[in-house]
Amino acid sequence: MINRLVIVAALMFLASCATRQDAPGDSVSQVESSGEKVDSFVETEIVTPGMLAAEKLASTEPSVYFDYDKFEVKEQFALTIEVFAEYMRAIPGSRLRIEGNCDERGTIEYNLALGQRRADAVKAVLVSMGIDGDRIETISYGEERPRNSISSEAGFSVNRRADLISR
C-alpha cells in the first residue's frame, strides 16, 4: 500500500511541475486579434555563379561557324566561346567536347582532317582564355553530320561549324 502511495505522490508531483504550452492555433489568433499582420514565409533561392553561367550557356548558340575551306575562328564568335569559358571556370568539374564539321565538298579524308583542325582551333581559343586543355575533347565528324542537306551555299555554310557540347 505504501508503494502505491509513493507512486501516486510521485505522479502528482511530476504533473504539478509540467508547464502548459499554448497550441499553435492560440498564438496565431492572439497575433491576429492584436492587429499585427503576419507575413507568409518567403522562400529565397540561392543563386551560385555556376547557376548563372549555366543559364547563360543555355541561351547561347553552341556553334562556331567557318568560311569555306578555313579553320580560323572568326572574331564574331569570341562571345560564344567566352560564354563556354565562363561556364567552365564557374563549374570546375565540367568538361567540353568540340565536334568539328564540314560541308559535303571535298573528300572524306580531307573533311575529317579539316573538321579536326576546326575543333582544335576552338580549343586553342579556350586554352588561351585559361581553360585547361585536358578538360576539352575534340573530335571530327567531317561531312557525316550535316545540319542542312541542301546543296547550296546557304546549306553549306550551316554545315561548316564546330559544335560545343558541355558535359
List PLM regions with ranges.
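Soluble non-cytosolic domains of exported or imported proteins
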Residues: 71-79, 105, 109-117
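A non-catalytic structural micro-motif
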Residues: 92-101, 116-147, 160-167
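Sec-dependent signal peptide recognition
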Residues: 2-8
